[in-house]
Amino acid sequence: MRTPLVLLLFVLLAPFARPAQAQNIQLHYDFGRQLYAKDQPTRPRWTTTVEQFRPDRWGNTFYFIDMNYANEGVESAYWEISREFSLGKTPFAAHIEYDGGLSNKFSYNNAYLVGVTYAWNAPSHQAGFTITPMYKYLAKQSKPNSWQLTGTWYRHFAAGAVTFCGFADVWGDRNLNDGKNNVVFITEPQLWLNLYKLHGVNPDFRLSVGTEVEVSHNFAVTDKTIVNPTLALKWSF
């Protein structure tokens, strides 16, 4: 699962989080291969995601690592790491980021991004969003200069028992076949039931069950919109 790039708000995705930092591990079963047998015949069924958000006096650091699995073991790994520097007491932060990874068949081209994030939180911390316009450098491309716009959001319901969160990205890229410019879109909304917020469940049993729906255009399949749902478990630390 390609999870949010700029989750400045990630600490709030675990409702009323105890420390001022957050990390989790997710396990997803992906139905994309069954739904698009012709377009995605080898799409991995299993993916794990590890995420961490850590704020400090200067801003915050966020990263995630996705690992896809085949019968033989890990098939590919992809990660993104970002650093944000607070701009005084404003809701803005300077943003720098690296994206890259590899698989047993190819390596992902490196991408380097720089931009500015705007973040908003409700006073109750029950809802919020970020938006980040960025310059994007596509390494090893004949036309490396590009752009990306990223948005993230979260909303808690039912006294923190339910969380709706996710991200949306749109960016300029190059077609793998002919090198022409194209625009890629992807969004991955997630819906979680946080079991540790239910009556009678120990709050230290920090398991969530839920789903993610990857909606993309020009991402998984060129010139086509694809919807890949998952069933998922998440343990928050």
What does each model-identified segment do?
Residues 1-24:
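Cleavable N-terminal export/targeting peptides
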Residues 19-21, 58-60, 84-95, 121-129, ...:
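Short loop/turn motifs that connect adjacent beta-strands in outer-membrane beta-barrel proteins
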Residues 20-70:
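Short glycine/proline- and aromatic-enriched beta-strand/turn motifs that initiate or cap beta-hairpins
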Residues 29-33, 67-71, 98-102, 133-139, ...:
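Transmembrane beta-strands of outer-membrane beta-barrel pores
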Residues 40-44, 69-76, 102-111, 137-146, ...:
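Solvent-exposed loop/turn segments connecting transmembrane beta-strands
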Residues 50, 81, 114-116, 149-153, ...:
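Membrane-embedded beta-strands of outer-membrane beta-barrel proteins
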Residues 138-208, 214-216, 235-237:
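Outer-membrane beta-barrel transmembrane domain signature
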Residues 225-237:
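Outer-membrane beta-barrel "beta-signal"
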